[in-house]
Amino acid sequence: MGDDDEHNSSSTDEGRKEVDIYPLSCYYFGSKEAIVFKDETVSDRITRMKSNYAAYGLRTSVEAVLLVELFKHPHLLLLQLNNSIFKLPGGRLRPGETDIDGLRRKLSNKLSASRDGNEAEWEVGECLGMWWRHDFETLLCPYLPPTVKKPKCTKLFLVRLPESRKFIVPENLKLLAVPLSQVHENHKTYGTVISGVPQLLSKYSINIIDI
Amino acid sequence: MGDDDEHNSSSTDEGRKEVDIYPLSCYYFGSKEAIVFKDETVSDRITRMKSNYAAYGLRTSVEAVLLVELFKHPHLLLLQLNNSIFKLPGGRLRPGETDIDGLRRKLSNKLSASRDGNEAEWEVGECLGMWWRHDFETLLCPYLPPTVKKPKCTKLFLVRLPESRKFIVPENLKLLAVPLSQVHENHKTYGTVISGVPQLLSKYSINIIDI
């Protein structure tokens, strides 16, 4: 639809963005040594965030939206921790690190054979959306809350996968392909950020490539 | 945030998109003759949609996201019908009409002094998202549902407002400025499409311009 737009191409180009996705069977999945998590509990995490904040100020998180095809429907790749929490692959930036460098580092750390692998292999594309929150609160907003002086930000990036690759995942994490239709508005299971991903992708034409 | 990205500028540009918004007080609001609605009831509407479908096939709807500033927070302009239903300004395309031409026509029809006014005055920008549905069902999906052969599509476009203009609204409609924070995830009051707008805007840096 809308392919008959001829005027004003600079503004309609955006509406025609495409993403090619490949069958899940094109990818190889293996495991590697477990990742050591820094915090045992939520309160440990908050303590660590506070001390990091004191040392470095606010840090941005970057997360990746990775898609594959299964049963003719786009599926989102999610990491699952302890058979419960779902996360998009990603994490916090180091002080001074760019969004793209940080996301590549995190993706290699969590999804590649070697942490020091070829990070350029990750094709980090456009920012799809951002979520903001008060310093140490859990409530997320898709806009900068009016009363917040020092917000924390999570940015989502579209990462286009090649037609084949290996995913090597720490053995204490599971990498799952979940249908967009299951994720959409399913806040309870997937949380605010993940359950909103189908909407952020809605302007893209998703092409299923048969191999 | 993210302003320190220097590599790979083609893919980070998208993450830096900006929207300038102006105070509500910069705009003039007036009224004009009521719009005649084609349907009295939902069942009238479905009957009309079916007969249109038989005559023209499926038609795309286009809707505008228009922002103003009030109390230092971005507000979304919504039309309200009968003190109840909220709608983004827009409507269905005519057969063969482009997204941009159709949206400009609808915006002039609902928000300008004259229907035949200068439609180019509306700066229709990028597509923010799309919603799909089965032919005559009301359930909306932000992805093409796998089983649907002939989906209907609603496309949302960002329309940047100039620093001043007149809005002349049919007297049976109200034009309201609603804070993004009130719209966000408020499905009950605003419906699926409108309540998702803050998330679709989240990748933009919204600049409040003081006049």
Where are these regions (language model features)?
Chain A
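N-terminal leader/linker segments that precede catalytic domains of diphosphate-processing enzymes
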Residues: 1-211
